[in-house]
Amino acid sequence: MFLQHGGIILAFLGAALAVGLSCVGSAKGTGMVGEAATGVLSETPEHFSKCLILQVIPGTQGLYGLVIWFFALNVMGAFSGGIKDMTLAQGLTIFAACLPMAIGGWLSAIYQGRVATASINIIAKKPDDWSKGIILCVVVEFYAILCLLASILLLMNAL
């Protein structure tokens, strides 16, 4: 069965990893920030919107993973009448094209969550300087965007 459908299996696995790992990383990252924010909000509930913005930032990688999932399924023909037959090499190409977003999205979401969690301390101590924490988070976001771009470009040239 793998020899007959191995290409399709690998392509689906790559797409699933792109969205799955990115969402796992985003869940971990946003969860860490939410935990840290509850302490601040118990003392100063007026900082809710600032804390919420920091919490949402690590969630973007999950969205990027979903974009790659759609791109991969589009390359496979899922939105144009049915999945195409593909060779093992073609499936491996799609699988490999999804890896930058899968691995990069997963790890960058966790590390961005750590930066955003630390940035919650800025809100607790100097609420007017909270935008500095956002800027620090954007540095990590840049690498998630590079992973997204790499996977998109690879998928555009996959077959």
What is each of the regions a protein language model found here?
Residues 1-159:
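Hydrophobic, small-residue-rich transmembrane alpha-helices and their short perimembrane loops
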